[in-house]
Amino acid sequence: DNSLLIKMEKIPVIPESFMGIMKFSSKEEYAYLCMLLMYLEDRDAQEQFILSQLTEYITANLPGDISDWTLYTNRRKLIRVLRFAVEQGIVGITDGGTL
């Protein structure tokens, strides 16, 4: 059992109510989660990063308004994704701050 691996499953033809992340309310949040996972894939397990590095990565890889950080809604969606990632043990906070 490797705790650093994530299992991806095939999406069924008909989505069921139990599928998905209940804390997410938009497709953009799933896109941010995928971007976060892609960003982390290129880093060592204990390597630290700052939020601006992640947002620069997302901006470079996601076109359009979804990566416009001047929009409050985009910042809130990213924070929701980061909170989920912390709850799941995907990332940790080392700066003493909270999301």
Where are these regions (language model features)?
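Positively charged, polyanion-binding regions of nucleic-acid-associated proteins
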Residues: 27-48
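Hydrophobic, Leu/Ile/Phe/Ala-enriched alpha-helical segments that form helix-helix packing faces
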Residues: 1, 58, 62, 82-86
